[in-house]
Amino acid sequence: MKAPVRVAVTGAAGQIGYALLFRIASGEMLGKDQPVILQLLELPIEKAQAALKGVMMELEDCAFPLLAGMVGTDDAEVAFKDVDVALLVGSRPRGPGMERKDLLLANAEIFTAQGAALNKVAKRDVKVLVVGNPANTNAYIAMKSAPDLDPKNFTAMLRLDHNRALSQLSAKLGKPVAGIEKLAVWGNHSPTMYPDYRFATADGASIGDAINDQEWNASTFIPTVGKRGAAIIEARGLSSAASAANAAIDHIRDWVLGTSGKWVTMGVPSDGSYGIPEGVMFGFPVTTENGKYTIVKDLPIDDFSQKYIDKTLAELEEERSGVAHLLG
């Protein structure tokens, strides 16, 4: 049996946490031969800690062969101690009458503290995925608050947008998602992100050629993917939790186990590719191998695409400047 991997999950008793933990413990994220120790963080309030205890009781009752241990805590330094993987799911949701900038600042406080705790106690090669929104900027804040860790250790989740786009293309083409490759999603995990199928193929044939409908792309596909989260809240009365948890599992599994040359989308600190300023946490097409991701380079960006990329970048820059004063 392999040595256990330590996985931290914040917001562990929340909706996404509940949809996530059982799948991690069953081996869906890191492999069916990889034991895990779950290190679970919840808010230091009685109700949250009681809920966390209940979730841990359920995890015990599953008797997962791969679950080698569990810790439940309200202290980030306990939750992040020696972790190999950290899923930062917990964030402050937007309350009634709350402006986006208030939301940014409330979350900046959380992710500054979590970045500092990771910096202090996590493994030096920890893989961090920020799921809690605004995910890109929260990941940027955590990264900036962990000066001793490699910035490449920090990522934001755009896999939900990627998977949503895959599913829309599959429905449009009447072809299974499994055959679709080379899809890209650029930018922020927000309605400004740009799902781009110009390079994508279904069973090896160009999707752009098969659809050949720029009107559908601009007025149906892009807005449907961008506003899917809102559509789910409208229908379900709750935000997408199971699909977000599924995307988090996909993101970490691919980062750790590799994509065998296939493109996936990750929010990563820019290296200057495609004119995105260095350090901006931006969605790019990537491939992964041996626990490292590589941005897919030198794709042609046409005027239509550039307009969308500029728009999502402008939003990220605005978010970044809104929290700059907190990061020194």
UniProtKB/Swiss-Prot annotation:
Gene Ontology molecular function: L-malate dehydrogenase (NAD+) activity
Binding site residues for NAD(+): 11-17, 107, 114, 131-133
Record organism: Xanthomonas axonopodis pv. citri (strain 306)
Chain's role: Catalyzes the reversible oxidation of malate to oxaloacetate.
Catalytic residues in the record: 189
Keywords: NAD, Oxidoreductase, Tricarboxylic acid cycle
A Gene Ontology BP annotation from the UniProt entry: tricarboxylic acid cycle
Enzyme class: oxidoreductase
Catalytic reaction list: (S)-malate + NAD(+) = oxaloacetate + NADH + H(+)
A Pfam family assignment: Ldh_1_C
Gene: mdh
EC number per UniProt: 1.1.1.37
UniProt: substrate binding residues: 94, 100, 133, 164
Name the record gives this protein: Malate dehydrogenase
Family statement drawn from the similarity comment of this UniProt entry: Belongs to the LDH/MDH superfamily. MDH type 2 family.
Top-level taxon of origin: Bacteria
